Amino acid sequence: MKKQALAVVLMLSASAIHAQNNIWQAPAGTSSLWEQFLDNLSDYDDIEAGNTEEMYELLRELETNPIDLNNATDDDIQRLVFLSNAQREELTEYLDRHRPIRSIGELAMIKSLDNVTLRLLNCFVYVGNIDESRKFPTWKEIAKHGKNELLGYVKVPFYERKGDREAYLGYKYKHWIRYKYSYGQLLQVGITGAQDAGEPFFGSHNKMGYDHYAFYVLARKLGKIRTLALGQYKARFGLGLVMNAGFGMGKTTSQVLATPQNSITANASRSEAAYLQGVASTIEIYKNITTTAFASYRKIDATLNDDSTIKTILKTGYHRTETEIKKRHNASQTTAGMNINVKHNGISVGATAVYTAFSKDLKPDKSQAFRLYSPNGNNFWNVSIDYAYIHPRISVKGETATGNSHALATINTISLKASRTLTLTAIQRFYSYKYYSLFSRSFSDGGHVQNESGMYLGATWTPFSQLKIMAYSDYAYHPMPVYRASKASRSIDNLIQTSLSFSPVDITLRYRLRLKQENGADASSPLIDKTEHRGRFQLNYKQKSFTMRTQYDMAYTTKTSQSIGWMVSQSAGYKYKERLECNAGVGYFRTHDYDSRIYTYERGMLYDFSFPMFYGEGMRFFLHLSTKPTKNLQLICKVGTTKYFDRDKISSGYQEINDSKKTDMEIQAKWKF
């Protein structure tokens, strides 16, 4: 009874807030407006696929090195991923006509930029003096005016896992360090060293200390060379059917954001997956004609068959036990590719070709039906053509690809600004069950650019500045088996979200209904319909230095049985000038099982978007402190505890904790010099 009473108190704790008319305010529990913006766009599909984390890192990097609007190129504007296609076009046109602008406030003249978007722009752009020469700076200027940043992190668990006692070769602390040198948007040099809990440090295979290093050099605007990358980098072309090592567009983000453009970006991630290593360059060979060439060689982790062929390519990056270490860097991957793109009067046409070879043949286990058409062999190639027409009122984009499977994949999108307040979006895709690309990442329901056809329809309506309604419906058909469905299957996904803003209050309501087919008792029985309902109510309040957020999440899933889950959480924050900021949160969750799991955002560390998942019954507490003792030094500490009421052990296998609670402390320091 006490638990239920506490939940009611948490839900009603913000009931005394009074509303006023004004623009949207950044809510509690976020360090900035853009983090809350990303939170509102994220659903559990994006979180599990890693899209949210990828986008977070991109925006955090952009916040650290903002764009100078008076010297911004088309490529710079394309990096503002939170702008729609129409907003990008109108912003570019305005800057071309009115440079030099004197303040960001001038952008209010652009009709498509609402109050929220203008405030988002404030996070990532600034107005500097126009540079007529636009030449790459001298090395003397770079050495004198460049910025250094050193960032360190450690996570201390106040518990012991089974693997810590029996199998892991390293200590239980996770830590990483990152150094970066930057000269605005023109030059970035950096190195990251990362260590997962349980991995040996300066021991075993890690003679150089950390288990994983990421190093890069990225230069922009070197005359005709638009971008030059050395070391580790990520590449994206077209709509991602052939090459996309960056973030993918989810169903919610596709409704709001413009499709990311062709790009070469530095890889400063701690992840050991989805990056290239070598050299890449984008060159302007003629006005409005660019070409990109790249080459990569890197070691990869793999599970091998008895004949030394590759059974599975591993992307977890864990090297804690003898077994995991044996799979470390036991194969290599060589990749080369090229893209050419032509733009003229809003029309864009491009072509991409990618070739990949492995040191050992790929030979996956095809006894599972959903792996029947997985890539097999040693040498792989893919080619595609992408096309686009961009206009302030309408944008059309698409890509069609094939490869050595001789199968076809195509995706086509159209976005129409039907009126000043209404935008309509449609996305059609057809991915043959025989098509595959080792670097594809694009819009899909099943998470793969393979074995899927479907249609997505969405709308965003803003009847007035304080109200935004977003909705979509997506239908997908899988002609061959997929994970958890041994026969042809269908799914329908629907969402509606309403955001109401009356400063100092912001309210968000979200409801999602998803229907999909899955296996019944066994693979030979008929497929069973699985219905999933998810909802969220979020109330944010901000007044001067104080912020507060109340949130209620629910999940209701039916298949052969019902699974019900819900969570109510309350967070609050206080900021004292620029020196001290404190955020704290508490939540109670209760779910039947994993099917009704709940994800919720909480304040995390720098370069770490925190979106923990909960199932079972328990409570979550966290305290987040950030201080700046000097202008160039920032210290952050977070303590989080999860207490379960329905179990006396947490997790399983080597991750098992012989306790009903789990407490971690994270410490981070950032020094700019």
What are these regions (language model features)?
Residues M1-Q25, F673:
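Bacterial Sec-dependent N-terminal signal peptides
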Residues Q20-E63:
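Long, low-complexity intrinsically disordered regulatory regions enriched in P/S/T/G and acidic residues
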Residues D45-R60, E89, R97-P100, A108-K144, ...:
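Alpha-helical interaction/regulatory segments in DNA maintenance proteins
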Residues T52-I104, L121-Y126, Q195, E199-F201:
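Amphipathic, charged-and-aliphatic alpha-helical interface segments
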Residues T138-R165, Y181, Q185-I191, L228, ...:
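Transmembrane beta-strand segments of Gram-negative outer membrane beta-barrel proteins
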Residues Y168-K172, L276, H329-P364, L372-F673:
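Exposed, low-structure sequence patches enriched in small/polar residues
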Residues A194-H212, T265-E272, K326-H329, A401-G403, ...:
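Outer-membrane beta-barrel proteins
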Residues M208-D301, L416, T421-S437, Y576-Y594:
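Outer membrane beta-barrel
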